[in-house]
Regions:
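Short, structured segments at the rim of ligand-binding sites
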Residues: 1-150
Length: 150
């Protein structure tokens, strides 16, 4: 298990953290992802929870949040999540999901191919717009993916 904090370049990029969450969910122990670049970046966590991940929102104790966070701290909402704790290892299970956005879609897909059972994704154009031919590329690496056109 490991902890990461997102940062602006050259730090750990915020775009990596959803995919990283899927990977570290397989690790033994507890890991924390602390998001300091974007507000409300953990929408994907609910999908991973539905697939079996043990994820809980946490609020890190930060002495000077205006200096740590790269967004306007005064704009935050009570429902905003700034970090999650992932307790592993996780054995992801399948499900049916409508992909809400690019990063959540790639995260669900990664969890699905690393887990057990059948997963059905709709609204996959969200994934396609950022990952060209991802199904073919992952299939060439041994993933079992079948694209069905409606």
């Amino acid at each position: 298990a490991t902890d990461v904090t997102t940062e602006i370049h050259p730090g750990f990029m915020t775009d990596w953290q959803p995919l990283w969450a899927t990977l570290i969910a397989h690790a033994e122990g507890s890991s924390i992802i602390h998001e300091t670049v974007m507000q409300n970046r953990f929408q994907y966590a609910q999908f991973l929870k539905e697939m079996g991940a043990d994820i809980e929102p946490i609020e890190p104790q930060v002495k000077h949040p205006q200096k740590v966070y790269n967004f306007n701290w005064e704009d935050r909402q009570p429902s905003d999540i700034h970090a999650i704790k992932i307790n592993g290892p996780t054995e992801f299970t399948g499900g049916e999901f409508c992909v809400p956005d690019l990063r959540a879609g790639a995260t669900i897909l990664l969890a699905a191919i690393s887990g057990q059972g059948k997963t059905v994704l709709t609204n996959i154009n969200q994934i396609d717009r950022g990952y060209e031919n991802i199904d073919q590329k992952l299939t060439s690496l041994g993933a079992k993916i079948k694209r069905v056109e409606n």
